[in-house]
Amino acid sequence: MSEARKDTVTVVGAGLVGSLLSIYLARRGHTVELLERRPDMRRETVDGGRSINLAISTRGLHALRQVGLENEALKHAIPMRGRMIHPPQGELVYQPYGKDDSQHINAMSRGWLNAFLMTAAEATGKVRIRFKQRVTDVDFGSGALTVHDDATGEARQEPGRVVFGTDGSASAIRQALEKRPDFKGTQEQLGHGYKELTIPAGPGGAFQMEKHALHIWPRGTFMLIALPDEEGSFTCTLFLPWQGPVSFASLDTPAKLEAFFGAQFPDAKALIPDLVEAFFSRPTGSMVTVKGAPWHAGGQTLLLGDAAHAIVPFFGQGMNCGFEDCVVLDQLLGQGAGWEQVFTDFERLRKTNADAIADMAVENFVEMRDSTGDPRFLFRKAVEKVLLNAFPGEFVSRYSLVSFSHVPYRLAYQMGALTDGIVSELSEGLPRAEDVDLKRAAELIRSRLTPFMKEHADGFRTEG
């Protein structure tokens, strides 16, 4: 069995997760055929429709560290130490992400990271990437694939091998699995779409807003965000409902767009010189939450990343979760079991965690657009900050558990509900955050959080 496990395997999808997975598999001794539907993004312009920037945090960096790629990747990252809230009127409001500046997330170019991982995969000498290869069918008995070569127009059979589906939220491998009678799943489209815009660098390549922050313009049913780029620019993303009084459907003329931005985002509008041209020429992206099971067909096929569990982008964890998939799979491969056992264990370990971060991402969307500018929300955040400083190691925010630890997502979700309850109780009737009753806080923390952390000690002891 151990010898057979070193056979050639097929990975479908050379995006972020597929490229990193190929590196992990190569390091385990496998030869990898990596099939990618798109052209080689390193040589041709690719219209992927995906966001230009992403946020990489502790889980994703850990996955890169295991294969020796973290340091190089961080050379191309910009630390974001908190949210910078742009209210409709008044002063900017800064909300730090962690207990201090050491806890930050990192803005990085999706395209740069994808190209970097492709090149690193090829550098193993055991990964061959074949582009313009579109999978149209899977034989789950043998692992044989029907592949359409978009360069030649020809279809052919790819030999039967173990197959990993990392081909994104519209995964061809998952769609084939969905035809099996044992598959149960849902796909929930968010009622909002997104459009990317750019704030260019200022004179001399200077950033025109605070560099080390994720900027948010929360406006209730819609919002604008901006992440810093290496070149001094900011990639902005406008999230709007598809339909309604304020929506992509309603902003159908340059005049309406200009008036909308002038009223809602005047400071951003002043920094986006090509607003009208960019808005009407760039694609509008959709967002989906994918849940389903099983993720595997015996020991022949396994889904990872967005193919298994696509989530909306509002916790910055889609890629981080997919990279963590690679780490968990690699750990299971190191235990020497056969493929079917590895795949079964992988799904058991990852499914509940993927569902948890999917739910948290939707909740964070509501928080970002509705609450980040709400005085009551800001007051609760101030109380939370007092508790974080007064009870280090005992009181931990959900955001910190998700972004700055390896605690399983499901435990972070459950712990977050407990901490929210404590903050709500302590905030009630409080005139100032610094007046929080620390004695009462200690009682609540030690009666609710401490027992939970002890009960799940293994999860809170994960490698950091």
From Swiss-Prot:
Known role: Catalyzes the hydroxylation of L-kynurenine (L-Kyn) to form 3-hydroxy-L-kynurenine (L-3OHKyn). Required for synthesis of quinolinic acid.
Annotated transmembrane regions: none
Reactions catalysed, as given in the entry: L-kynurenine + NADPH + O2 + H(+) = 3-hydroxy-L-kynurenine + NADP(+) + H2O
This protein's encoding gene: kmo
EC number: 1.14.13.9
Taxonomy of the source species: Bacteria, Pseudomonadati, Myxococcota, Myxococcia, Myxococcales
Protein name as catalogued: Kynurenine 3-monooxygenase
Stated family: Belongs to the aromatic-ring hydroxylase family. KMO subfamily.
Pathway named in the protein's UniProt entry: Cofactor biosynthesis; NAD(+) biosynthesis; quinolinate from L-kynurenine: step 1/3
InterPro entries in alphabetical order: FAD-bd, FAD/NAD-bd_sf, Kynurenine_monooxygenase
GO BP terms: anthranilate metabolic process; kynurenine metabolic process; L-tryptophan catabolic process; NAD biosynthetic process; quinolinate biosynthetic process
UniProt organism field: Myxococcus xanthus (strain DK1622)
Molecular function (Gene Ontology), one example: FAD binding
